[in-house]
Amino acid sequence: MRHYEICFIVHPDQSEQVPGMVERYRAIVTAKGGSIHRLEDWGRRQLAYPIQKIHKAHYVLMNIECDGDTLNELEHSFKFNDAVLRHLTVKMKAAVTTPSPMMKEEKSKSMMPGDAAPAAPAETAAA
């Protein structure tokens, strides 16, 4: 079995459907003996360029191990799902389980203590 990294972008109106979609894709992979090494939900983010007059979309990243038939079935389900705006599959040499740079960036932003401190004086000044 080979290792793949898959990133897909979901229409923002369908953001609440993402967990169900991920479970469906997880079932496709695991049904044929594959495994998911990393699954990251990046949430709603700004697109680099508009797709179908949409400027924001929901991003999901998966690192999986599967055979060619499973990958074809997965990509087929991406193509015929109207909620998936774009998808990209990259073949990897080994399984990737570490957090992606996007998640590291999000985690560092959320852990910065400086974010909470400036917000408090601004609120007190307004009151």
Swiss-Prot record:
Pfam families: Ribosomal_S6
Transmembrane segments: none
Region (Disordered) residue spans: 99-127
GO CC terms: cytosolic small ribosomal subunit
Superkingdom, natural source: Bacteria
CDD domains the UniProt entry points to: bS6
GO biological process, one term: translation
Compositional bias of kind Low complexity: 110-127
Stored SUPFAM superfamilies: Ribosomal protein S6
Molecular function terms from GO: small ribosomal subunit rRNA binding; structural constituent of ribosome
Keywords: Ribonucleoprotein, Ribosomal protein, RNA-binding, rRNA-binding
Family: Belongs to the bacterial ribosomal protein bS6 family.
Function: Binds together with bS18 to 16S ribosomal RNA.
PANTHER family for the chain: MITOCHONDRIAL 28S RIBOSOMAL PROTEIN S6, SMALL RIBOSOMAL SUBUNIT PROTEIN BS6M
Name of this chain's protein: Small ribosomal subunit protein bS6
Organism: Dechloromonas aromatica (strain RCB)
